[in-house]
A protein has these predicted regions:
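Class I (Rossmann-like) S-adenosyl-L-methionine-dependent methyltransferase catalytic domain
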Residues: 1-59, 100-169
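Local beta-strand N-terminus motif with an aromatic residue
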Residues: 9, 65-66
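A conserved beta-strand element that flanks and buttresses the S-adenosyl-L-methionine
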Residues: 69
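Short catalytic micro-motifs in class I SAM-dependent methyltransferases
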Residues: 72-76
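Short N-terminal helix/helix-N-cap motif within the alpha/beta-hydrolase-1
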Residues: 78-82
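A short glycine-rich, Lys/Arg-flanked "PGG" loop and its adjoining helix->strand segment in the class I
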Residues: 83-95
Length: 169
């Protein structure tokens, strides 16, 4: 679903890339960053960085990105870091560039806790979700540099897709 929201001829910033799957699916070049990056074979035009966005992202002096994705990432970012996170993205995206974000509905955390309590699932990092509210994204990405292009719920309403476009300054 997120792939459909990306512009063609994309220079992509994949925040939370894990193994670079999105680069393989789209054929895009760019940078993938993830603190839990796994070893992946080199991909032409793609730089993989083990670390956190934005602090560990290498300088990008030559070219802006025309798309960024953060799929199931923002709910793991501490609330006091989100404004800087959005501001950093604005400085890296070209005018008209898109940021595609997916976040779970708060109901998902409750469901995960019940399933973990019943020992039906394990290894879920629900405690890292910081009580994130999807509706907060509209205020985090408020301001003259962003325009909400799309918001929809998917997977029976358990997840949200947001697409913000970078406006010209």
């Amino acid at each position: 679903m997120a792939v459909r929201e990306l512009p063609k001829a994309t220079r992509l910033l994949d925040i939370g890339t894990h193994d670079g799957t999105l680069f393989r699916l789209t054929g895009a070049g760019g940078v993938g960053i993830d603190p839990e990056l796994v070893d992946v074979p080199p991909m032409a035009g793609v730089t993989m960085v083990k670390g956190f966005f934005p602090g560990d992202l290498p300088a990008q002096p030559d070219e802006l990105f025309n798309a960024a994705v953060a799929l199931a990432v923002l709910e793991h970012i501490p609330e006091d870091e989100l404004a800087n996170w959005a501001k950093s993205l604005a400085g890296l995206l070209s005018a008209g560039g898109r940021v595609v974000i997916t976040v779970p509905a708060p109901t998902v955390d409750h469901m995960l806790h019940v399933l973990m309590g019943l020992h039906l699932i394990a290894g879920i990092e629900a405690h890292q979700h910081h009580g994130f509210q999807p509706a907060d994204l509209e205020s985090i990405f408020a301001g003259p540099q962003w325009r909400l292009a799309r918001h929809r719920r998917f997977q029976l309403g358990l997840n949200h897709l947001y697409v913000f476009e970078r406006t010209s300054d």
